[in-house]
Amino acid sequence: MKKKVLIIAGHPDDEILGCGGYFDKFKNKYNFKILFLAEGSSCRYEDKTKYKVKIQKDILFRKKCALKALKIFSITNISFFDHTCGQLNKVPQINLNKIIENEINDFKPNIILTHSNKDLNLDHKT
């Protein structure tokens, strides 16, 4: 039976930057599940109202890129939670804990990987 690995990522692209080599090495040995907690695009815009349509297009594009990249490793078990980029520290911790707890209970991973606690990005620290 294959081991199960849960990847908890702040944004789409963090999983590839942090675990791309791991995916390649273990793609035939492990089953992967990826969680994206934030959408990863809106924090690039100061005026979120003015650029609302552009932001939504960027979020959708980023999701499509993540799905395409993960498909290379045959990873299709992916969840997007779309919290606002750069603001995970403002989401009540209990809400994030519930998301992660539910995913752990459903997927039952043997291994959980996430960002380093020394990462400077607030979404990654949260």
Put a short name on every predicted segment.
Residues I99-T126:
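Active-site adenylate/phosphate-handling loop in enzymes that bind or generate adenylated species
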